[in-house]
C-alpha cells in the first residue's frame, strides 16, 4: 500500500528524507524573500525542492513554499518512488480514482490537532499570518494555497455537496478577507443561493494541509462529488480524518490543518479585490469580489504557514493543477469514447489540452475534441485542443510536435469556434469570460476521409529493445 500522510508535517518529513526539502535557517524578510525563493526553486529545472523557512522577521512561526513544486514531490505525495514518470503517475491516479468514494473519519474535537489553539477575540490576521505580496504589483497580501470549505445552503446537510476548493484570498483588514468566486466555481453556485435569501454563506479557510487535500481542492470534480472522499480514494482506500467546524455543524475541516479561519461571506457586499499575479503568468486586474468576515481562528501549536508562488510557468501552481485536471477529463471522455488513451491537460489548468485516441471513423478526432469542450471544466477553461493518434504519447512533446508537423493540413485540420465561454483570468480573452477556441486534428485520416500519402509508420529494427537494455547496462558500468 502507498504511503499515507496524516498531515502536512508528515509529508515534509518525507520530503526532507528524500532530499526534496531545503531548510533556510537564517532569518529572512517576508517580502521579497519568501516569494523570491519560491520563484528560484521553480527555476532549478529538475528535482525542485520545497523550501522551509525557520525564521521570518516579525513572525514567530515557520513558513513553507513549493511543497507541490516538482514531479518528484508530486510522486512522493502519491506514495510512489520520487522518480516515477509523469505518465506513470497519470495512470496510477486513474487507477485510484476508481476507488471513490472513500468516506472520511469524523474525529472528536479533542483528537484534532487543528483545534489545539483558539482565537475568538481581538482577531488580527496581520499578527497571526506572515503576510506578504507574492508578486510586486499585487493589490495586497494574499493567501494563495488555502483549501476553502463551504456547503450548499439549500442542502446544508448533504455531505456530497460540501465543497473544498482553492480560491485566491486577499487579506484586507484585521478580520476581513476578499475571495474570488468566479462563475464556473462551485463556491459561486453556493454563494448565489445564499445571497438570493440575503443570508451569509458559512466558510472555513484551511491552511497547511495533507498534500492530497490541497491537491483535490485544486481538482475539477462534480458538484455532487466530495473532495474528502476523493482524498481517501487517492490514499488507496485509506480514509482521511476530518472534524466539525466550531461555528457551523455542517462544515467539516481537515483534522490536521495548520490554521483554520472560520467565518462567513457577507451577503450582497462587493469590494475591490486585486490586482493579483495569476497562474497564466500575468496580472489579472482589480475586480469587485465578495468579502469574508473572520469570526474564529483555530491553529496547531507552532503552526506552519504554507503558501505558493504563482508566476510564468512552470511554478508550483502548475504542478498542483496538472494531472488532477487531466484525469477527470480523461474519465469523462472515456465514458462515451472508449478509444481515448490519455489526456494531457497540464498546461495552464487545461487551457491547452492534448488528447491521444484511436480514431474510429472520419471526423472522430474532432468529435472527441468537441466532447472535451463540453465538459464542466473544458467548457470554460479549455481553449486549444490538440488530438493525436493512439501511438503518440501526449505527455511527450517531441512526439506531439512530430504529429503536428506531419499529420496536420492547416486548411482542413484546424477548426475555429467563435463566441465560446472562456476563463476570464486568461489574458487573451476578449471580453473577459468569452473566447474563440481552436481544435487541431493531428491524427492520421481514416475513411471516409481521403488517405494521405506515405503515412505507413516505420517499425524499429529487430533487436532494438535488447540493445536498449544492453546500452543502459554499458552506460551504467561506464559511469561507476
UniProtKB/Swiss-Prot annotation:
Keywords: Aromatic hydrocarbons catabolism, Decarboxylase, Detoxification, Flavoprotein, FMN, Lyase, Manganese, Metal-binding. Optimum pH is between 5.6-6.2. Its cofactor is prenylated FMN; Mn(2+). One of its GO terms (biological process) is catabolic process. GO terms for molecular function: 3-octaprenyl-4-hydroxybenzoate carboxy-lyase activity; 4-hydroxybenzoate decarboxylase activity; metal ion binding; protocatechuate decarboxylase activity. Inhibited by Zn(2+), (2,3,4)-trihydroxybenzoate and (3,4,5)-trihydroxybenzoate. Ammonium and rubidium ions decrease the activity of the carboxylation of 3,4-dihydroxybenzoate by about 20%. Its EC number is 4.1.1.63, 4.1.1.61. It catalyses: 4-hydroxybenzoate + H(+) = phenol + CO2; 3,4-dihydroxybenzoate + H(+) = catechol + CO2. Residues 443-466 are annotated as: Disordered. Mn(2+) binds at residues 163, 185, 227. Optimum temperature is 50 degrees Celsius. Binds 1 prenylated FMN per subunit. SUPFAM superfamilies: FMN-binding split barrel, UbiD C-terminal domain-like. The active site is at residue 278. It comes from the Bacteria. Belongs to the UbiD family. YclC subfamily. PANTHER family: 3-OCTAPRENYL-4-HYDROXYBENZOATE CARBOXY-LYASE-RELATED, FERULIC ACID DECARBOXYLASE 1. It is not known, if phenolic acid decarboxylase forms a complex composed of ShdB, ShdC and ShdD. The term subunit is often used in reference to the operon, however there is no experimental evidence to prove the existence of the complex. Homohexamer. Involved in the non-oxidative decarboxylation and detoxification of phenolic derivatives under anaerobic conditions. Oxygen-sensitive phenolic acid decarboxylase that catalyzes the reversible decarboxylation of 4-hydroxybenzoate and 3,4-dihydroxybenzoate. This is Phenolic acid decarboxylase. It comes from Sedimentibacter hydroxybenzoicus.
Amino acid at each position: 500500500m502507498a504511503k499515507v500522510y496524516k498531515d502536512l508535517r508528515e509529508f515534509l518529513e518525507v520530503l526532507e528524507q528524500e532530499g526534496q526539502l531545503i531548510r533556510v535557517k537564517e532569518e529572512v524578510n517576508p517580502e521579497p524573500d519568501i516569494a523570491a525563493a519560491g520563484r528560484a526553486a521553480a527555476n532549478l529545472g529538475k528535482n525542485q525542492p520545497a523550501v522551509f523557512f525557520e525564521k521570518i522577521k516579525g513572525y514567530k512561526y515557520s513558513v513553507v513554499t513549493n511543497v507541490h513544486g516538482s514531479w518528484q514531490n508530486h510522486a512522493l505525495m502519491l506514495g510512489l518512488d520520487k522518480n516515477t514518470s509523469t505518465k506513470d503517475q497519470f495512470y496510477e491516479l486513474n487507477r485510484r480514482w476508481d476507488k471513490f468514494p472513500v468516506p472520511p473519519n469524523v474525529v472528536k474535537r479533542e483528537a484534532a490537532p487543528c483545534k489545539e489553539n483558539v482565537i475568538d477575540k481581538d482577531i488580527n490576521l496581520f499578527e497571526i499570518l506572515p503576510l506578504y505580496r507574492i508578486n510586486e504589483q499585487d493589490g495586497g497580501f494574499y493567501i494563495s494555497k488555502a483549501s476553502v470549505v463551504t456547503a450548499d445552503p439549500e442542502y446544508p446537510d448533504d455531505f456530497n455537496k460540501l465543497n473544498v476548493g482553492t480560491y485566491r484570498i486577499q487579506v484586507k483588514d484585521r478580520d476581513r478577507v476578499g475571495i474570488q468566486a468566479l462563475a464556473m466555481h462551485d463556491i459561486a453556485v453556493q454563494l448565489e443561493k445564499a445571497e438570493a435569501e440575503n443570508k451569509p454563506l458559512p466558510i472555513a479557510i484551511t491552511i497547511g494541509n495533507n498534500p492530497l487535500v490541497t491537491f483535490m481542492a485544486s481538482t475539477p470534480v462534480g458538484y455532487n462529488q466530495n473532495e474528502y472522499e476523493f482524498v481517501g480514494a487517492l490514499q488507496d482506500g485509506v480514509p482521511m480524518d476530518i472534524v466539525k467546524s466550531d461555528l457551523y455543524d455542517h462544515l467539516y475541516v481537515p483534522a490536521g490543518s495548520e490554521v483554520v479561519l472560520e467565518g462567513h461571506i457577507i451577503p450582497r457586499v462587493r469590494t475591490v479585490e486585486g490586482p493579483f499575479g495569476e497562474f497564466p503568468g500575468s496580472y489579472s486586474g482589480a475586480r469587485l469580489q465578495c468579502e469574508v468576515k473572520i469570526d474564529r481562528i483555530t491553529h496547531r501549536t507552532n503552526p506552519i504557514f504554507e503558501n505558493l508562488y504563482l508566476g510564468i510557468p512552470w511554478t508550483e501552481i502548475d504542478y498542483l493543477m496538472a494531472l488532477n485536471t487531466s484525469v477527470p477529463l480523461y474519465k469523462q471522455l472515456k465514458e462515451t469514447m472508449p478509444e481515448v488513451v490519455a489526456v494531457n491537460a497540464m498546461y495552464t489548468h487545461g487551457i491547452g489540452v492534448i488528447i491521444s485516441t484511436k480514431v474510429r471513423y472520419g471526423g472522430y478526432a474532432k468529435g472527441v475534441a468537441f466532447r472535451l469542450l463540453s465538459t464542466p471544466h473544458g467548457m470554460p477553461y479549455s481553449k486549444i485542443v490538440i488530438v493525436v493518434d493512439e501511438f503518440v504519447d501526449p505527455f511527450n512533446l517531441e512526439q506531439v510536435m512530430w504529429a503536428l508537423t506531419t499529420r496536420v493540413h492547416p486548411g482542413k485540420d484546424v477548426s475555429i469556434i467563435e463566441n465560446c465561454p472562456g476563463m476570464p483570468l486568461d489574458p487573451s480573452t476578449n471580453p473577459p469570460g468569452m473566447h474563440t477556441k481552436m481544435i487541431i486534428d493531428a491524427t492520421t485520416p481514416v475513411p471516409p476521409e481521403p488517405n494521405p500519402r506515405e503515412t505507413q509508420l516505420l517499425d524499429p529494427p529487430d533487436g532494438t529493445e535488447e540493445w536498449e537494455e544492453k546500452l543502459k547496462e554499458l552506460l551504467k558500468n561506464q559511469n561507476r
